[in-house]
Amino acid sequence: MIQNKKSVFKGWNFLKPKLGGVNEAGEYGGLYQSSDGKITAMIKKERSSSKNIAEFLGSQIFEAISPGNGAKVNLIAPDDFNKSKSVDSQIYVKSEFFKNYSSDMYVDMDKYMSAKTKPSSWFRKDGGRPLFMGSRNKLFRTLEKAFKEIKYQNFEKIMPASLLIGDFDIHLGNIGVIRNKKNPKTLPRLVRIDFAGSFDNLTDNIYPHSRIRHLPGFGPTNHFREFPSSLRTKNPDFADSLLAASKIDLSKIIDKSVDKLTKYYSNEAIAKFAQRAMPKQFNKKSHAITTEEIKASLIDIMKKRQVSLQEYGLEIKINTLISKKYSFPYYEVKKQELKTLIKEYPDYFEKILNYAKSKNGSLKLKLRDKVTTNFARILEIFCIRDSVKTHLLKTITSLNEDIKYESNLANSSDKIKNESKPKSVKTDRYGTREYVDSLEKFYQAGGIDDVVCVTPSKLGLMSKAKQEDQDLLKLDAEDLKHIKNLKEKLMTPTKITESSIFLNKKHTLTKTR
């Protein structure tokens, strides 16, 4: 059997079967090594093609958001593969191991936490994975102790993309740990190693704190809630990563990834994945669903979820900018940092301010971190002092007005500067003297009284009189002054003699050297 497994996937040698985990690996699944011995990978498949498609697609988007922090995943088929509906079930997912990969987070915690702080041996699956990790953390602060004691790094790098692709199956068995054996002082780094829980009934919002949407029978447990609140709601680095992830254009990677799916899976298999991932968008029969429709819907829903990521990131940012104060007004806001946020994300704060006005498209201000006391709440109830939200909204309103005032002031200043600039020269000062020479001839010919109504045609410049409505050059006092100065600069002789010459009964000056 092992010999057969060695020959099934070209370029890969079978090492051993897959151990542990909830799901089986398929007939040919297991641990493999590349023929050159450089790469180790887990090759497996879920029973459902939709889950395999979700793992591949989820990994591609994860890599686009957080390069190098998720497993490198590709599709692989047996050597005798020939794409058809009957062989959709033969497609496997190949997940390459990280360099310096140690183990999953469950195993790492058992190995490196102290006997007093690591998860107890009670309530474990098959003697291995601890169960009820969320309850353990609430009762014993197990995960908080793990992050404090072992100092795991990279939480803020792996969670934004996981939330974006709807992968809440982020229990500790689906999080790997990288340890640098050559430099033990390097802190352990967290990475994502399994994306099969991705794209499960996606909605426009990410709902990171929801319990109801993740009840038994309605999808995987929201394991994100199990992590300490200090990482989820009070972490400015996490907020920055959420905001960065919200700005990445995923159109090309989605287009490219769906095209690759068509090389392995039948149209029906891809359509069924779309129905599972986006049931509201694809409530028609699978044979009527096209790959172009799937691409467009995926791009659209990812953009909407990125907006939700942004709102979550800003929510955390705002939480970090306000703190308790024991004198009036009892709250301290970092106004300059808040003002910078308002300038960068004006639409978000406009929604926040519109909520109090009950306008459509508004957004409720959420404060996850407690910055008040029970006694303070009593004072708020009796309107003796503002609530933290009221105080914050007043501050946002005031800062928003300041920004608008500064913007108007800057625009007015620019307008004044533009108006105070000298008007553009109506003549070509440094090029041809055609205009000035013609104007001088007109002046000498006795047209000085009509100079305020000079036309190009009168000056003999027919090329400047192409359109009738543009024929008239209206020269104001400033123009005349400028022409006079220009004439003095261009035509001032080194020596001037005055003589009386009559031309058309007018006196003129004759310039001679």
Curated annotation (Swiss-Prot):
It holds the Pfam family LepB_N. It comes from the Bacteria. InterPro entries: LepB_N (IPR040519). This is Uncharacterized protein RP538. It comes from Rickettsia prowazekii (strain Madrid E). The lineage of its organism: Bacteria, Pseudomonadati, Pseudomonadota, Alphaproteobacteria, Rickettsiales.
